[in-house]
């Protein structure tokens, strides 16, 4: 009877890697993950959020993420994140699952050859965090409070040290409160995106609307209602030339930074350049909302005021650029009265029945 021969691996034996080599390889893998997500069309903010989740898990684990086991995930999600908000737990879990899917497709063989570890996702059907992402309930400031904010801010324009930058910040915040644009949509507006000839009041071409599920930016036309046309006319005619360079230049930004590009043209303002002045104005003129008033709160305020003024949900949905009407309903909850109306109608029906019994 033939005997079984000893099978020997003919591949070159891999020496144990130095810690520096493992660290460099981990950095390369992480950089490849970021590049792959960018290639998939995800926005920079989404990628930054995933990276933040992974970095926090890595800091807790204190070793490469591919060494994380289901037992480690049980400890992390069962103790460290036990009392964390549902959205935090779900986001961190999804980031880990996506990262390990990337490792499995691109680097599993290399990781095994280098470390002897077979990388597997530590999140399974047993320990996967349950729950559903729900938007936070936001109650925007009242119309009187927002009026007080912009009245005080406008008065400050007469005495401020730099008129043009403050007027730019004022006009951008005012526009967000009037037609509900997102801060990233506002910063990407060009001067040529204002179409005065369209519609009754003019329209603005939003080219960088928020996308979803890798759709990329969603464009839309927003009518300059609710006084937005007056805000933009004042800014373009009286302020823009103090910050911008050539109004006929293709791609000239609507809201310019004080800095310039390498070629001498006006640079585009960043999102933080719009957020910080709004926070400062709220602290000065609306202290009840200090550290709470953001561009997104102004967006909720706009939706609530449009609904309160009689605008239907479909029109508000188109103005805000929502893909689903259910999202818009979360924005106008403050002024919706269907519960109160149902209660009043029920009381009236009960009163009518009692009248019939007493007659």
Walk through the language-model features, giving the residues of each.
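Short, basic (Lys/Arg/His-rich) helix/loop patches that form interaction surfaces
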Residues: 158-161, 275-318
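N-terminal core-binding DNA-recognition domain of tyrosine recombinases/integrases
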Residues: 31-136, 156-161
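C-terminal secondary-structure termini that scaffold catalytic or DNA-interacting sites
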Residues: 1-17, 346-359
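Basic, Lys/Arg- and aromatic-enriched nucleic-acid-binding interface segment
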Residues: 148-183, 249
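Active-site/catalytic core of tyrosine-dependent DNA strand-transfer enzymes
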Residues: 225-289
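Conserved tyrosine-mediated DNA breakage-rejoining catalytic core shared by Y-recombinases
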Residues: 188-232, 240-241, 246
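Catalytic-site neighborhood detector that most strongly recognizes the C-terminal catalytic loop/helix
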Residues: 320, 326-345
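Flexible interdomain linker/hinge and immediately adjacent N-terminus
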Residues: 9-13, 109-153, 210-213, 258-267
